[in-house]
C-alpha cells in the first residue's frame, strides 16, 4: 500500500475510539499492507485480544510475507500462545514456508507450541501462498485511496451513534476544529440549493431591536425603537390595552399605554376610560399621552398639545406668562409631551396609576392645552377647562383621570399621577409637565392638579390653565419675570416649574392660594397623591415662584400645602418649598410642612433664584425651575419628588441642592431662600448649585434627613408624600403617601430613599453617587419601585453625579438627568441610567445623560430630554447637554437659549440617543421628547 493510503488508514484508526471502529477502519480498506505496515498497525491495538482481532482483519489484506517478516509481526505479541494464533492467521500469506527456522525459533521453550508451529507451517506450505506479491499489491485498488466507498469514520461515525457519512464528502479532517472532527461534516446543502439565487419565500424582516439609536431627528418613522414614531401610534391609540401589548415591543410607549391602560383602568376607571379616551378622545391628551406613547399620536397630540399648550397659553392667557410661556410651552410642551411619554411610561410604570396619569399627564401635557386633555376637545378649551377644571379639578381628576387616576385621582391625583410620572416627568418637566401633566390630567388636571390643589381658588383659573400653561407660564410668569427673563427656557422650564409654582404663584399671586395650591397639588399630587405633594412639588415651585405671593397661596393650595405653604408661604420661598415640601407635607404641614418649609425654602429659593439670577439661570430654567421644581419636587422634599418633578430638572442641583440642601438647610431657611438659595439655589445657581447640590446631596443624603429634615415630620409622615416621598421612599413612608405617591414617593423616595439610602453616596458624591446611584438606585428603585423610585434613585444619583460633574450646570443637568431618571424610569434602568449617567455625567452629563438616558429609559434621556421635557428644564438638560456649562448658563440665560437648549438637548446626544423621540415630538424636541419616548420604553421595560 502506498504511503499516502497507509497514512489515511492510520488516520482512521487513530480517530476511532472503540476497537470495533478501529477494526472497521482496517476491514474497509481496499488494498494490501506490507509486513512493516502491519507491524505499525498493530501498535494501535493494545493487548492480545485486540491485536489478534486486528490480525484477523489484516489476514486477507496483506502482501505475501517472508518468514523473517513473519517473525517481526509475531514479535508484536507478548505471549507465545498469542503468537501461535497470529501465526495461524498469517500462514496463508507466507511465501517461503519451508524456510521456517526463524519462525520455529520463536517457540523453542515449549515443545507443544513448537510442534504446533511446525504443523501450521506445513499446512501453509501445502496450501501455498494466497496473498498477492508486492509487485501486485495495488491491484484492484486506486493509489492514494484505500477507502473508495468512503472512510469508515464517515460511514459509521467515529463514536457509536454518530451520523453516517456520505460519499462524496471530503475525507480529511485536516484543518478542522475539534468539533468538526468529532461531529463530522455538516449535512450537505440540498442539490437544489443555490446560494446565489433568491429564495422562493420572503425572508422575514429582522425584528426591530435597539442597535444604533436612530437619528434623533428622524421623523420618517424609521425608528422602531420606542415606537416613538408616529406610525406606531395607532396601536397605542386604539386603546391602552392594545398599547399595552405593544408595550412589549415598545416598552416606552407601551408602558405608558399600559400604564395608561392598566394603571389607568386599574387606577381608576375613569382614568381607564380616560386613557382610552386620551388615546381616543382626548386626542390631545390621550394623544399626547398616547402620543407620547405613540409617536404619531404623540406627535399629533403633542403637537396639538404643544399647540394647545400654546393655545392653552392663550387659553390661559390669563397668565401673562402665557405668552412667555407659550414659547416655552411649545418647546417644553413638546418636549414635555415627548418626554411625557417616556416619563409617562416610566412613571406609569412606577405608579401604575400614576403612570397612567402620567401618560395622562403627558398627555395632559400635551393636553395641557387640553386640560381638557381629558377632554381632548377641550384642549384649547382647557384653558378654561382647566379653570373649570380646577373646579373640575376633580373632574380633572376624573378627567385627569389619568392623573387623577392616580391616587390622586383628584387633580392631585392627577397631578400626582402625573407627577409621579408626570411629576417626575412633569416635575421634570417641571412645571411644565406638571402643568402638563396636570394638563394632561386634563389639563384641567393640571389645573386641577395645579388647580386641583388649587382648585380651591384661583387655582381654577390660574391653575388650570395656568397650571399647565400657567404653570409653565405662570411659572414663567411669576418667575417669568425673572425666569422668563432668565430664559424662556429656563423660564419655561422653570416656568413650568415655576409656572407651576408660578402658576401657583401666579395663581397664587392672582389667586395665590388656589394657584399655589393648585400647583402644589399638582406637584404634590404627584408625589403625594395627596394633592399636596404634588402641589407641593410644584407648589413649592409655584410657591417659590410665587415665592411670597404665591407662597401663601401656594401653600394654600395644598391646603396642607397651604399650611405648610403657609408656613412656607410665609417664607415665600419657603412657600414653594414648603409647598413642595408641603406638598406632601403640607398636608401634613407638620408632616409635610417640614418638608414644606424646607422644601419651600428650597423651592423658593430656587425659584427665586432662578428668576433672580442667571445662576439659577444657569440652571436657569432649570435651576429656577429646578428650584421650584425642587421646591416642589425636590423640595418637596421630595426632592426626589421634586426631582421627579420638575424640580429635578430644575436644577437638579437646585432641586437637589436646594431641595436637599434646602431641604435640609432650607428647611428652615426656607425663606432662607437664602440658605436654600444660597445653598442650593444660588450655589446652585450655577456652580454652587452643585455644591448645594452636593449639599443637597448630602442633604440628599440627608435628603432623607433633609427631607425628614425638612419635612422631618413631613418626611416622616409619609404622608407628606414628599417627605414621605422621600422619606417614604426611603422609608416606605411612601406607604402612606402613597401608595401611589408611594411610588412617587417611592420614587422620590427612591430618590430620597435612594438618596438616603445612598444618601451619602448619593448625595455627596455624585460620582459615587452614580454608582451609588446605582446602588441606590437599585434599592430605592426597588423601594421606589414605584415609578419614581427608580427614578429617584437613579434620579438622585443621577442628580448627584450630574451635579458634581458639572457643578454649575451640571447639577441642573444632573438634576435634569435625575429627573428624567426618575421620571423615566430611572427605574427602568436605573442602572443603565446611572451608568449612563455616570459616564454621561462626566462627559457631558447631559448628553450622556440623555444618551444614556436612553438608557435611563428615557428618563434619563430625558435627562436632557427629560428636562427637555421640561423643556425648560430641558434647558437644563440642555445645559448640561450643552456640554459646556457655560453654555448651560448661557442657555439659562436666554429664552433663546431655551430653544437652543431644546435644540441642544436635542442635538445633544440625548436626543440622538433618543431618536425614538419621534414620539411626537420629533421636532422638538427631539431631545426632550425623545428621551421620554425612549424612556418609556426603557423605563417601561424596566418598570415592567
Curated annotation (Swiss-Prot):
Q: Which residues carry this modification: N-acetylmethionine?
A: 1
Q: Which UniProt keywords apply?
A: Acetylation
Among InterPro entries, the record links this protein to:
DUF4476 (IPR028011), PROSER1 (IPR042616)
Does Coiled coil count among this protein's keywords?
no
Q: Spans of biased composition, class Polar residues?
A: 248-274, 932-944
Q: What does the UniProt record tell us about how this protein is modified after translation?
A: Glycosylated. Interaction with OGT leads to GlcNAcylation.
> Assembly and partners?
Interacts with TET2 and OGT; this interaction mediates TET2 O-GlcNAcylation and stability by promoting the interaction between OGT and TET2. Interacts with KDM6A. Interacts with TET1.
So what does this one do?
Mediates OGT interaction with and O-GlcNAcylation of TET2 to control TET2 stabilization at enhancers and CpG islands (CGIs).
Q: What is this protein called?
A: Proline and serine-rich protein 1
Organism, by scientific name, is Homo sapiens
Higher taxonomy? Eukaryota, Metazoa, Chordata, Craniata, Vertebrata
Q: Which gene encodes it?
A: PROSER1
